[in-house]
């Protein structure tokens, strides 16, 4: 399987860096772990002490443990969720300006995996994070209930490649894209069969992307593009014998 990492203004047009198995040539790579300034917000928690109530969610990730996101997750308010386009993004948070409840000197990094619907703290235009309880308790005491925080976007560090779970049926391929490094938030996916041209997929919901082409019996390749306009192209991720319900692993962003 060959893997190309492309920095571009328009998908497939201008390549600045290439990553092939065993080698990497620098080009448009963005160094550093953080992607934006510190911004004021608030945070609460949900899901119980074992975070079991955080499973599923509006991003479509399902079991957050098996998908590799674990306890370090958050539901985002409307202002941050961006109708699901923020799914997979990573944020660093620290509790501030509340010495009674903040645990001094600690910060956490969480992945956006769910939506916090309007109502109370999550009403627009509030910037609000509803964290899993275990990760909340790393920066604040349980009894605090709600805390002021500062947050910033950071690059996601993932183990292994981007994962593609193929659901649906013939003429309806619904692909869940998970474990995305770098910016983390997928804004575009294209796919091709070994006998077809590249085709842009449409986002169905969360991070589920669909194609209505008949691709049975063909090896499948994918292009994943994140909000920073960087892309990873993974050739022949799924073999011709692929089947619905299975997960296949491709390349990964450099960070």
Swiss-Prot record:
Limits of the Expansin-like CBD domain: 171-250
BP GO annotations: plant-type cell wall loosening; primary root development; unidimensional cell growth
Disulfide bonds: 59-87, 90-156, 95-102
UniProt topology in membrane: Peripheral membrane protein
Location in the cell: Secreted, Cell wall; Membrane
Residue ranges constituting the Expansin-like EG45 domain according to the UniProt record: 56-161
Pfam family, one: Expansin_C
Keyword list, A-Z: Cell wall, Cell wall biogenesis/degradation, Disulfide bond, Membrane, Secreted, Signal
Keyword Transmembrane helix: no
Cellular component GO terms, alphabetical: extracellular region; membrane
Residues spanning the signal sequence: 1-22
Similarity comment text for this entry: Belongs to the expansin family. Expansin A subfamily.
Function statement: Causes loosening and extension of plant cell walls by disrupting non-covalent bonding between cellulose microfibrils and matrix glucans. No enzymatic activity has been found.
Name of the protein in question: Expansin-A5
Gene label: EXPA5
């Amino acid at each position: 399987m060959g893997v190309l990492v492309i920095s571009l203004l328009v998908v497939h047009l201008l390549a600045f860096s290439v990553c092939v198995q065993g080698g990497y040539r620098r080009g448009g790579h963005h160094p550093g772990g953080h992607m934006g300034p510190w911004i004021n917000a608030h945070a609460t928690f949900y899901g119980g002490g074992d975070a079991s109530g955080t499973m599923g969610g509006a991003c479509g990730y399902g079991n957050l443990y098996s998908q590799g996101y674990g306890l370090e997750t958050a539901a985002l308010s409307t202002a941050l969720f961006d109708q699901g386009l923020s799914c997979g993004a990573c944020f660093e948070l620290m509790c501030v300006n509340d010495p009674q409840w903040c645990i001094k000197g600690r910060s956490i990094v969480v992945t956006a995996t769910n939506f916090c619907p309007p109502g109370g703290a999550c009403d627009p235009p509030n910037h609000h994070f509803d964290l899993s309880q275990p990760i909340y308790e790393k920066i604040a005491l349980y009894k605090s209930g709600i805390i002021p925080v500062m947050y910033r976007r950071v690059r996601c560090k993932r183990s292994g490649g981007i994962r593609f779970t193929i659901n649906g049926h013939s003429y309806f391929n619904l692909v869940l894209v998970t474990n995305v490094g770098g910016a983390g938030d997928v804004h575009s996916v294209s796919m091709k069969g070994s006998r077809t041209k590249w085709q842009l997929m449409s986002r169905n919901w969360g991070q589920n992307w669909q194609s209505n082409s008949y691709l049975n019996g063909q090896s499948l390749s994918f292009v994943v593009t994140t909000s920073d306009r960087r892309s990873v192209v993974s050739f022949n991720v799924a073999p011709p014998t692929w089947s619905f319900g299975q997960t296949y692993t491709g390349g990964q962003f450099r960070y």
